[in-house]
């Protein structure tokens, strides 16, 4: 079965479960869910330049952030369609680059929200915290212990991934409240 502390999210999208059983249903749900989330993020970030690009500099910065968000979203979709037990290298490429791309997105949108008068500054602080969280996770990906070096290293990497995904979800919720309170979303 699936272990919260020893299985990455991607293990739900594997072709076969760790015990050798076929994992078709979970694999299909995993791919579909990441596709839906990826398409939703692409749509969301394509709208933001029109909402936050209230001057030339912000408009340019939002588009840079949006381009990286699209890249991260495409990587999210790619992660769903590359089961780790079938095509490991492409899967790792897509999975890691979700966070590399959204790191750049978070940096640019932190700057934009600080510069903009559309959202209150606390939402920029929230985005800055999101940036720091992703940066921490990217550092863990690059320099943290290898999952193959022992059980404690595996647990550390798996729980780090769980934490950043939870932070990602809360960041989206926080931004949604910001746009709702500002009257942009009704």
Feature roles, as predicted:
Residues 10, 27-35, 92-103, 157-168:
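Alpha-helical transmembrane segments of polytopic membrane proteins
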Residues 68-113:
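Membrane-proximal helix-loop-helix units in multi-pass membrane proteins
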Residues 105-186:
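Terminal transmembrane helical module of multi-pass membrane proteins
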């Amino acid at each position: 079965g699936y272990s919260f502390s020893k299985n990455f999210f991607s293990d739900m999208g594997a072709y076969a479960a760790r015990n050798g059983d076929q994992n078709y249903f979970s694999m299909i749900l995993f791919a579909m869910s990441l596709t839906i989330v990826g398409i939703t993020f692409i749509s969301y970030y394509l709208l933001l330049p029109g909402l936050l690009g209230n001057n030339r500099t912000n408009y340019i910065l939002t588009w840079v952030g949006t381009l990286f968000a699209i890249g991260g979203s495409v990587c999210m979709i790619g992660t769903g369609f590359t089961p780790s037990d079938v095509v490991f290298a492409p899967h790792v490429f897509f999975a890691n680059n979700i966070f590399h791309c959204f790191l750049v997105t978070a940096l640019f949108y932190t700057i934009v929200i600080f510069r903009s008068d559309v959202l209150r500054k606390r939402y920029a602080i929230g985005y800055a915290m999101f940036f720091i969280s992703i940066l921490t996770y990217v550092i863990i990906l690059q320099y943290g212990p290898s999952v193959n070096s022992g059980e404690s290293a595996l647990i550390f990497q798996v729980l780090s991934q769980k934490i950043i995904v939870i932070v990602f979800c809360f960041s989206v919720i926080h931004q949604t409240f910001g746009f709702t309170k500002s009257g942009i979303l009704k």
